[in-house]
A protein has these predicted regions:
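Non-transmembrane, juxtamembrane loop and terminal tail segments
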Residues: 409-430
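Helix-loop-helix junctions that connect adjacent transmembrane segments
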Residues: 87-226
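Hydrophobic transmembrane alpha-helices that form the core helical bundles
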Residues: 3-80, 244-254, 316
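Membrane-helix boundary/coupling elements in multi-pass transport proteins
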Residues: 19-20, 42-56, 144, 149-162, ...
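TM-loop-TM module centered on a large, flexible mid-protein loop between adjacent transmembrane helices
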Residues: 23-27, 32, 122-125, 141, ...
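Transmembrane alpha-helical segments of multi-pass small-molecule transport proteins
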Residues: 65-82, 90-96, 113-114, 280-289, ...
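C-terminal membrane-solvent junction of multi-pass transporters and transport-like membrane proteins
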Residues: 84, 270-275, 318-389, 419-424
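Transmembrane helix-loop boundary segments of multi-pass membrane transporters
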Residues: 65-86, 231-234, 293-321, 373-390
Length: 430
């Protein structure tokens, strides 16, 4: 629901402005130039962290074949960065969903119909007996759950490049919502049917190669479908490599856009003969080499740290999008822009964005429940998790305060927001 509300808020604003306007540009026009500046950089940081995160995930998947002690993860990254992979992901995931359903119904080599036995025998909160323990269990899943949906707001790019923004916004949001519903939620349900929570292969606490495998690989192995294991692991490896490639592309585009808007050094504007922003791409690629930290550290630990950072950047980006939408609504009302002039209108309007803002704040606060464990015999404080989870917040505040202090800019008044009305941006578009 949170993701849907964010998508609707973005869809309403993005479908109003012209193609050349970015998400950061929306914030500059409707809310505050400092927020637009900050959103651009936070958005770039989010995707520049996702790239090494996905490369780290690739190392974890590849460790199923060759342990890190035998072949250093740094070797894998040198190989992976030579690939440009995309387009196959939907086919792979749909195949995994069908395979999982067949295995759950007893169609695997073991002919064991698992059904919902793990939902009944162990349950959703197995091992947690107290309300506080169950709350902590929910909070513990928030970073990875939020990370799963991060990037959903990229539909804004689709809307901005649509010839018919009214139709394009609604269709893009619907397709994204259905993708989340089918691929993410259905996949989670099926995995819950196939894999018990306390399976040793999921612990990832030893150096046995099975513990570094994907949950889907563990599910297939549990059904004794050995012939599919290596093929499935290879498919998942290509999956995360494609995600890393996409994140690198988005980060490069955002960084170049920041330079175009004079919010980043002008050297980033340099392009090659084909129009590729080579300096921005090179800078992002260099930062992606953070994945080589696996050479001196545990891949699983580093993977979790990247998720913590990316999750917080995503939440801050969502908060900025929602604040921009609320400012856009205030500006429309102040300038008396009728609803019928909108290319797309968020179904729940300002109320939906306000509710989504509350949920974003709650998710941010909930992270502290897992960082500090007051119920342990020895009070545990994971300072690394704290830093990687919350470092983005002071950075976010410093970017806003620094931009305001340097430029002396003021927040945009609703009556003075540049909405371009009554000369509607799309009045001349087909």
């Amino acid at each position: 629901m949170l993701v849907y509300l964010v998508l609707c808020a973005l869809g309403e604003v993005a479908s109003w402005f012209p193609i050349s306007t970015t998400v950061a540009g929306h914030a500059q026009r409707c809310c505050d130039p400092a927020l637009g500046f900050t959103l651009g950089w936070i958005y770039w940081l989010k995707f520049i962290v996702i790239t090494p995160n996905q490369l780290t995930a690739a190392a974890l998947v590849a460790s199923y074949w060759v342990d890190a002690e035998t072949l250093n993860p740094g070797i894998w990254f040198t190989i992976f960065l030579t690939f440009i992979l995309s387009g196959y992901k939907i086919v792979v995931v749909l195949g995994l969903l069908i395979l999982s359903l067949v295995l759950a119904l007893g169609g695997g080599p073991d002919h064991e119909r698992k059904g919902f036995r793990y939902w009944k025998n162990q349950g959703a909160f197995a091992g947690e007996q107290t309300p506080i323990g169950r709350l902590r269990a929910i909070c513990r899943t928030m970073p990875s759950a939020t990370f799963t949906y991060s990037g959903s707001e990229l539909i804004g790019v689709t809307i901005l490049h649509s010839h018919n923004p009214r139709r394009g916004a609604a269709r893009a949001i619907q397709l994204t919502f259905y993708r989340i519903l089918v691929l993410n939620l259905v996949g989670t349900v099926l995995l819950g049917m196939l894999v018990p929570y306390n399976l040793d292969d999921l612990a990832n606490t030893s150096r046995d190669k099975v513990t570094t495998a994907s949950t889907f690989v563990v599910a297939v192995q549990g059904a004794h479908a050995a012939v599919l294991l290596h093929f499935l692991n290879a498919s998942l490896l290509l999956f995360v490599l494609s995600s890393a490639n996409q994140a690198l592309w988005v980060a490069t585009r955002i960084l170049h856009g920041l330079a175009v808007d004079h919010n980043a050094p002008a050297i980033l504007l340099q392009t090659g003969s084909t129009g590729t922003p080579i300096v921005a791409l090179g800078g992002c690629a260099v930062l992606s080499s953070l994945a080589y930290l696996n050479i001196s550290g545990d891949s699983r630990t580093l993977f979790d740290q990247f998720i913590n950072m990316s999750t917080m950047f995503s939440l801050l980006a969502w908060i900025s999008i929602l604040v921009t939408h609320l400012a856009f609504i205030r500006a429309r009302r102040a300038q008396r822009v009728p609803d019928k002039a909108l290319a797309f209108k968020a179904p729940l309007g300002a109320f939906g964005s306000a509710i989504a803002l509350v949920f974003c704040v709650l998710i941010i606060v909930s992270r502290s429940f897992d960082i500090v464990d007051p119920g342990a015999s020895i009070r545990r404080f994971d300072y690394i998790a704290f830093l990687t989870s919350y470092l983005a917040i002071p950075l976010y505040v410093c970017l806003i305060a620094g931009y305001k202090g340097f430029t002396r800019c003021a927040s945009v008044s609703p009556s003075e927001a540049d909405l371009g009305y009554p000369n509607h941006f799309f009045s001349s578009r087909p």
